[in-house]
């Protein structure tokens, strides 16, 4: 594991250089980061009781560096409701800060990204619709000859990778539907993740975050063309991330105060954030956007990905062989390396998917949609309809073999029905 930790650290340093500080007890660099953009900032940080010690530490650092806090704002609710984004955008417009400093998890940082876009590029109209999809923010910024405010992100939860990635979600609560902005221009200019901050995270939050990070790496690994120039880098980032989570998460769930395991999971999910800059997520992430009112995002992705593994299997056979090695301890011992090597793609996909489910069971994680309270068949219809939305088309294109909206009913519905019951016998494959 030490070698994997060193590899993860090197990959992250090669990616972000001096713009990202990570490790244990590394918050002090915040003052220098914020000072690069001016002598004042808008501070976003939770006012909940759990954050009191962290808030004091952040305030002390900013005061020591003579940085004026123009306003202090509470963090977004989970899943970044659009109302929270608009509220924050209005505060940004009224305070005119030199920078935005956001201390929080993925939802809080996503909210800061979204609000920055609104306040900077649409100050007279609180409408995010023009920015949804891929590359829309940069295009509009260039057309209007405007720039976003500098954003410094201080991550507090392992999982989303929002502090080092180009993605930002927002939820339309009335429709119970999540949407996505994906553009490298919204990536925070500076980021910090002191993994010791995660020591107090409860077990469910810890697991869901880790599985979210794993899903980023897994889906991007699946969707990246093995003949592409970047493939070797993608493979290294994704497989390092996945293997660290598969090895360390069961240990961490039994020892939540173990700083070594916390660091491993932090590094691994950070690699998932790095992966988001190298490629895009696909099926499970797409469907998770329609399940926000009954389960967390990470939980939805974790349940769905084994079934997409089977669906994608005929297009990713060589990738599955490497995943079989990572999940080896969760594979039936009767399957020797020689026997695994001789399996056809579909059988290999089922074997790896069953190993993923065995891993989930090891950490007391649900393995099918029917186990989730509140789930019913209407959610399958909702996921199918959302998959046809042009704003989410990139998720279909990111599949190992891209789907079009007109093929969603034929190919995606059987996968979702399988995920409902835990049955891998569906006939359709992606090719």
Q: Where in this protein do the model-derived segments appear?
A:
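ATP/NTP phosphate-donor binding region
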Residues: 1-99, 369
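Short glycine/serine/threonine-rich phosphate/pyrophosphate-binding segments
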Residues: 27, 51-55, 82, 107-112, ...
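Glycine/threonine-rich beta-strand-loop-alpha-helix active-site module
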Residues: 83-196
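Flexible, glycine/charged-enriched surface loops at secondary-structure junctions
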Residues: 227-237, 252-264, 278-284, 338, ...
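C-terminal charged capping/lid subdomain of soluble metabolic enzymes
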Residues: 331-431
């Amino acid at each position: 594991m030490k070698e994997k930790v060193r590899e993860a650290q090197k990959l992250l340093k090669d990616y972000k250089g001096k713009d990202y500080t990570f490790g244990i007890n590394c918050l002090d660099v915040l003052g220098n980061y914020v000072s690069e953009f001016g002598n004042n900032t808008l501070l976003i940080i939770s006012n909940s009781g759990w954050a009191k010690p962290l808030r004091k530490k952040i305030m002390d650092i900013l005061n020591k560096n003579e940085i004026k806090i123009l306003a202090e704002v509470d963090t977004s609710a989970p899943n970044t409701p659009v109302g929270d984004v608009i509220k924050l955008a209005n505060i940004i417009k009224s305070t005119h800060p030199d920078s935005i400093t956001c201390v929080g998890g993925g939802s809080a940082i996503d909210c800061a990204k979204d609000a920055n876009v609104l306040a900077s590029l649409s100050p007279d109209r609180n409408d995010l619709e023009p920015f949804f999809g891929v590359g829309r923010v940069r295009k509009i910024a260039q057309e209007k000859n405007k720039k976003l405010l500098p954003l410094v992100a201080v991550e507090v939860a392992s999982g989303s990778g929002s502090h080092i990635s180009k993605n930002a979600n927002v939820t339309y609560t009335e429709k119970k539907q999540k949407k996505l902005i994906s553009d490298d221009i919204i990536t925070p200019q500076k980021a910090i993740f002191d993994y010791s901050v995660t020591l107090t995270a409860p077990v469910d939050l810890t697991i869901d975050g880790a599985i979210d990070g794993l899903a980023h790496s897994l889906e991007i690994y699946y969707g990246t063309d093995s003949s592409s120039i970047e493939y070797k880098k993608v493979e290294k980032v994704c497989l390092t991330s996945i293997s660290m989570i598969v090895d360390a998460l069961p240990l961490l769930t039994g020892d939540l105060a173990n700083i070594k395991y916390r660091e491993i999971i932090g590094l691994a999910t950070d690699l998932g954030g790095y992966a988001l800059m190298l490629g895009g997520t696909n099926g499970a992430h797409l469907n998770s956007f329609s399940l926000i009112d009954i389960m967390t995002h990470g939980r939805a992705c974790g349940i769905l990905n084994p079934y997409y593994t089977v669906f994608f299997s005929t297009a990713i056979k060589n990738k599955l062989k490497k995943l079989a090695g990572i999940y080896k301890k969760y594979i039936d011992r009767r399957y020797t390396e020689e026997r695994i090597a001789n399996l056809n793609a579909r059988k290999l996909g089922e074997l790896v998917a069953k190993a993923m489910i065995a891993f989930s069971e090891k950490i007391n994680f649900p393995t099918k949609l029917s186990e989730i309270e509140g789930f019913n068949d209407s959610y399958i219809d909702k996921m199918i309809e959302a998959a046809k939305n042009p704003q989410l088309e990139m998720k279909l294109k990111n599949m190992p073999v891209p789907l079009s909206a007109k093929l969603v009913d034929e190919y995606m519905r059987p996968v979702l029905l399988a995920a409902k019951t835990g049955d891998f016998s569906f006939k359709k494959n992606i090719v």
